[in-house]
Curated annotation (Swiss-Prot):
Biased composition (Polar residues): 131-144, 422-431
Skewed-composition ranges (Basic and acidic residues): 412-421
Subunit structure: Homodimer; facilitating circular RNAs (circRNAs) formation. Associates with the spliceosome. Interacts with HOOK2. Interacts with ZFC3H1 in a RNase-sensitive manner.
ZnF endpoints (C3H1-type): 595-620, 621-640, 641-656, 681-698, 700-718
Keyword Nucleus among UniProt keywords: yes
Modified residues annotated as Phosphoserine in this record: S85, S240, S309, S327, S343, S390, S409, S498, S515, S527, S620
GO cellular component term of the entry, any: nucleolus
Keyword annotations of the record: Acetylation, Differentiation, Isopeptide bond, Metal-binding, Nucleus, Phosphoprotein, Repeat, RNA-binding, Spermatogenesis, Ubl conjugation, Zinc, Zinc-finger
Record's protein name: Zinc finger CCCH domain-containing protein 14
Organism: Mus musculus (Mouse)
């Protein structure tokens, strides 16, 4: 950027800071408006008149301050550069006395065309030539400075000749005010005059042997080691026909030299301002300036643009300076592309820490491996292969020994040995297949014996029955004869593990209508009385119980045996020596509890059985309360009734801790019975006697508005006159 633009930006930032100090800063429009007035050289009175609407009582104070700053910029001193104090930032230039009125207010221009102001220094040996490019714009060196926090740190920029100036020469001394808020970088830029499209202010310095020095006090040099300090020194080259510029930026040196080799002209400074481009100016205040190096000997070179990042650190270059000198006939400059500036103000922008935190959390969620708990597999039993020896055949074989043992007739006893042999020969197959057996309930009902498996003789004499379940009786066992074979053990194991009473029924056998009965006795305490009828109780006391032929259950072995029971049963069958531990059987009997009925316990919450109660005790609260339609039969918890046992509401949805007394239904209001003769009360509808024995018809709820022609209720015949008939009108006098 040009030095004029930098000065204008500093003036604008100072104006903005002053407005904030006065409490009059609202947005960027007011500083831009003030800069336009400064560019148009408004007087103090005109500024006071124009700004009184915005600043109010602070208008005069602000305009006095602003014009004081502008007067300081116009002040001319004759002090030589060698006598200047190190704590002041001074920019010296040799100009004629008739054109020494250099104002920072002239830096900003409105979009309207304003003739450029050229301030030139004239010396006897001056030549009117300028450093320019042949085809494209060239920019001079951007010098970046960082100021210390110390109040005594200043930057002194001096343009001085190598010889003492003449007494007649005028010097422009630019000293910043304490409240100018000049704490940003100072950039020097030389731009191509041929490419100008805006009103500019050009400052031209002429000298035979000039040099530009940037001086910094030793204290600030020691304090700021990471700051890039630059000194631009200009001196003529041995060949006066061509020019060259050189800049080296080093972080460890106090000053570095860049060379400009054309003696007639030192530099050309241009500044433009337009309020319509303030977005670009704001962008300049955020971004660091583009940094370029260029050496112009007889030939030109391609120069890489150097730029600064936001944190002030300089990006490293890819190649050394010495390799940049080429033998090209033209100059190619690559301008730095400014970074995109967000349109929102900083106060409305998203916090960078929140964005970084969200990015880190997203990366953690992607990289983190979630350990999912293994889904427990269901206990499944392998199903026996579907062969001609089907499941019903295996089940019949399993109960064959049990059915043969309790024989009554002698022919059955003769066949008993044969059945035992058959059961023993097939015991291994039973043990192998029973652990994998899953019998469908329908197969139990429709079980038939296969003729391929049994011969006709065994079919005639063998008692083939299927297992059925009548009612859950936990303490009943089948008492069988002492001689038991493997088939009997199988049936007994099934009966003990299931905990239910197993009974059998005959298949349809036309040649044998009378089937032998299977005698069952009770071992231990009889079943609860509620589970059997009176006849069954009498049979239990006698020690015998008939077989219920008609109670056919739809439940098969799958309903009787759970997977755990089938596993234990298979282990017991595979253990013919009887070494199967009784502890496992005990654990099974303990684990096997009757399933609770899906009916709410009427004694809850005062039930004494606790968890052993077969009825349901609510645990979780009811979500439909108080609109629950189940009332006290709901399987979920309802709040307690505050009346408890005294509650007389039959359908009270609340919970009652103790049982309520039998709720007496409220007596219906006794309506007077109509008389037997049905005579209408003569005073109706004006009768006021509550126990009038005569008939009083019931009034229709719609009264005279009823539209049903067949309505059986009473409708008064005397109607109320219309509204207009009820209006009183004063009678007219007969005068």
């Amino acid at each position: 950027m040009e030095i004029g633009t930098e000065i204008s930006r500093k003036i604008r930032s100072a104006i903005k800071g002053k407005l904030q100090e006065l409490g009059a800063y609202v947005d960027e429009e007011l500083p831009d408006y003030i800069m336009v007035m400064v560019a148009n050289k408004k007087s103090q009175d005109q500024m006071t008149e124009d700004l009184s609407l915005f600043l109010g009582n602070n208008t005069i104070r602000f305009t006095v301050w602003l014009h004081g700053v502008l007067d300081k910029l116009r002040s001319v001193t004759t002090e030589p550069s060698s006598l200047k104090s190190p704590d002041a930032s001074i920019f010296d230039s040799h100009v004629p006395s008739n054109k020494s009125s250099f104002s920072r207010g002239d830096e900003r221009r409105h979009e309207a065309a304003v003739p450029p102001l050229a301030v030139s220094s004239s010396r006897p040996e001056k030549r009117d030539s300028r450093v320019s490019t042949s085809s494209q714009e060239q920019k001079s060196t951007n010098v970046r400075h960082s100021y210390d926090d110390g109040a005594s740190t200043r930057l002194m920029s001096t343009v001085k000749p190598l010889r003492e100036p003449a007494p007649s020469e005028d010097v422009i001394d630019i000293k910043p005010e304490p409240d100018d808020l000049i704490d940003e970088d100072l950039n020097f830029v030389q731009e191509n005059p041929l490419s100008q499209k805006k009103p500019t202010v050009t400052l031209t310095y002429g000298s035979s042997r000039p040099s530009i020095e940037i001086y910094r006090p030793p204290a600030s040099r020691n304090a700021d080691t990471g700051t890039h300090l630059n000194r631009l020194q200009l001196h003529p080259q041995q060949s006066s026909a061509h020019a060259a510029k050189q800049l080296d930026v080093q972080s460890s040196q106090v000053s570095e030299a860049g060379r400009l080799c054309e003696p007639p002209v030192l530099s050309s400074v241009e500044d433009t301002y337009s309020p319509f481009f303030r977005n670009n100016l704001d962008k300049m205040s955020i971004e660091d300036e583009n940094f370029r190096k260029r050496k112009l000997p007889v030939v030109s070179s391609v120069v890489k643009v150097k730029r600064f990042s936001h944190d002030g650190e300089e990006e490293e270059e890819d190649e050394d300076y010495g390799t940049r000198i080429g033998s090209l006939s033209s100059s190619v400059s690559v301008p730095a592309k400014p970074e995109r500036r967000p349109s929102l103000p900083p106060s409305k922008q998203a916090n960078k820490n929140l964005i970084l935190k969200a990015i880190s959390e997203a990366q953690e969620s992607v990289t983190k491996t979630t350990n999912y708990s293994a889904v427990p597999q269901k206990q499944t039993l392998p199903v026996a292969p579907r062969t001609r020896t089907s499941q019903e055949e295996l089940l019949a074989e399993m109960v064959q020994g049990q059915n043969r043992a309790p024989r009554i007739s002698p022919p059955v006893k003769e066949e008993e040995a044969k059945g035992d042999n058959t059961g023993k020969s097939q015991g291994t197959q039973q043990r192998q297949l029973l652990s994998r057996l899953q019998i469908d309930p329908v197969m139990v009902e429709t079980m038939e014996m296969s003729q391929d498996y049994y011969d006709m003789e065994s079919m005639v004499h063998a008692d083939t029955r299927s297992f059925i379940l009548k009612k859950p009786k936990l303490s009943e066992e089948i008492v069988v004869t002492p001689n038991q074979d493997s088939g009997m053990k199988t049936a007994d194991a099934l009966r003990v593990l299931s905990g239910h009473l197993m009974q059998t029924r005959d298949l349809v056998q036309p040649d044998k209508p009378a089937s032998p009965k299977f005698i069952v006795t009770l071992d231990g305490v009889p079943s609860p009385p509620g589970y059997m009828s009176d006849q069954e109780e009498e049979m239990c006391f006698e020690g015998m119980k008939p077989v219920n032929q008609t109670s056919a259950s739809n439940k098969g072995l799958r309903g009787l045996l759970h997977p755990q029971q089938l596993h234990l049963l298979s282990r017991q069958l595979e253990d013919p020596d009887g070494s199967f531990s009784n502890a496992e059987m005990t654990d099974l009997s303990v684990a096997q509890k009757p399933e609770k009925l899906l009916e709410r316990c009427k004694y809850w919450p005062a039930c004494k059985n606790g968890d052993e109660c077969v009825y349901h005790h609510p645990i979780s609260p009811c979500k439909a309360f108080p609109n629950c339609k189940f009332a006290e039969k709901c399987l979920f918890v309802h709040p307690n009734c505050k009346y408890d046992t005294k509650c007389t509401k039959a359908d009270c949805p609340f919970t009652h801790m103790s049982r309520r007394a039998s709720i007496l239904t409220p007596k219906p209001v006794s309506s007077p019975a109509p008389s037997s003769n049905g005579q209408l009360c003569r005073y109706f509808p004006a009768c006021k006697k509550m126990e009038c024995p005569f008939y009083h018809p019931k009034h229709c709820r719609f009264n005279t508005q009823c539209t049903r022609p067949d309505c059986t209720f009473y409708h008064p015949t005397i109607t109320v006159p219309p509204r207009h008939a009820l209006k009183w009108i004063r009678p007219q006098s007969s005068e």
